Amino acid sequence: MKNLILLLIPFITFSQVDVPDKYWLDDSSFDSAISGTSAFGDDNTETIVVEFWAKFNEANCLAEWQEIKNAKYYRVDIAKAPKAKKEYRIRMAPTILILKNGSVEKAFKAGLDLLLPTDLAEIQETINEINQASNF
């Protein structure tokens, strides 16, 4: 059993960090990606999920990020976005913020154990609640 676990660790870790470049934000792209307006000045009412990530804790990131529905997903390497990290008071990674119109609606912050503080079902439920509330 121990050998099987050791054999699977590299595959699990790889799948968790296999996020295409277009989903990664740094300080130069963060504000425009999460702001409440688009490049054309239109209101952007899409819900946005931002995961603050750290290389030292990549095993605890959101592996199922592709399954998020009705929201845009971005990942931020805290080493490459110190301004965003400071602005949103990110102390531990992973931390997941759910934003609407540029404002944080919900935050899931890791504790001292550095474990992902939520799961996909809770994130999706929060997204659905935020989207429903904004339909009125």
Language model region names:
Residues N3-T13:
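Sec-dependent N-terminal signal peptides
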Residues Q16-Y23:
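Cleaved targeting-peptide boundary
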Residues Y88-K100:
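Structural micro-motif
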Residues Y23-K69:
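Local sequence-structure signature of Cys/Sec-based thiol-disulfide redox active-site neighborhoods
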Residues I34-G36, I78-K83:
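N-terminal post-signal-peptidase region of extra-cytosolic proteins
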Residues I98-F136:
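Non-catalytic, surface beta->alpha helical segment in thiol-disulfide oxidoreductase systems
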Residues K55-E58, K80-K83, S103-E105:
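Solvent-exposed loop/turn segments at secondary-structure junctions
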Residues F52-K55, D77-A79, G111:
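Active-site-proximal beta-strand/loop segments in catalytic clefts of secreted hydrolases
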